Amino acid sequence: MTEISEYSAKLPAPVEQFILHWGDMGSHWGVNRSVAQIHALLYLSARPLTADDIAETLGMARSNVSNSIKELQAWNLIRRVPILGDRRDHFEAETDIWEVAARIAAGRKEREIDPAVDALRACVSDAADDPTISPVASKRLKEMLAFTELVDRFYMQMLNVPRPRLVALIKLGEKIVSFLPTGKTK
């Protein structure tokens, strides 16, 4: 468990479970556990929260909350909202789960896929001019580049698909998969 266990009386059990689970999942995805827990709390909150509210509810250091808020804002997953009569910053999460997924995917593409494509292109180009590169290594670099570019193109195409059509496409994919034979094929 994490920090919030001693503060659990302040949160309903399902909310606490979700926050803890989201924090664990975040750490598996390469996101700081505190960042993921704060996102989960704001996602489920019925009202905008201050950094002090977050720190108290989750039992986190205020500095940790501040840094985590900056990271969530950089991912465009939360926003600062003004509250009339209160000078403190309040924060709320994007609650449209499709939008959350799109923003996370965009952030991961920018931070991971784009640099990978650039690096692989450079490696393939450099390998073409290097007589010390084995044909096996050259072939595998080209295959990895082709795969990464394919994933990148697919992502870019999916950005332009309206949500209702995307939902229909996902459901269609489920139906198609049910007709395919099971087991791995090469």
Language-model segments: which ranges?
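C-terminal regulatory/oligomerization modules of transcriptional regulators
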Residues: 128-186
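Short, cationic-aromatic polyanion-contact patches
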Residues: 29-34, 50, 83-104
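Amphipathic alpha-helical dimerization/coiled-coil segments
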Residues: 98-143
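Glycine-centered, phosphate/nucleic-acid-interacting loop/turn motifs that mediate DNA/RNA or nucleotide
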Residues: 76
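A short acidic, leucine-rich amphipathic alpha-helix
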Residues: 53-56, 72
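N-terminal leader segment of winged-helix/HTH proteins
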Residues: 1-28
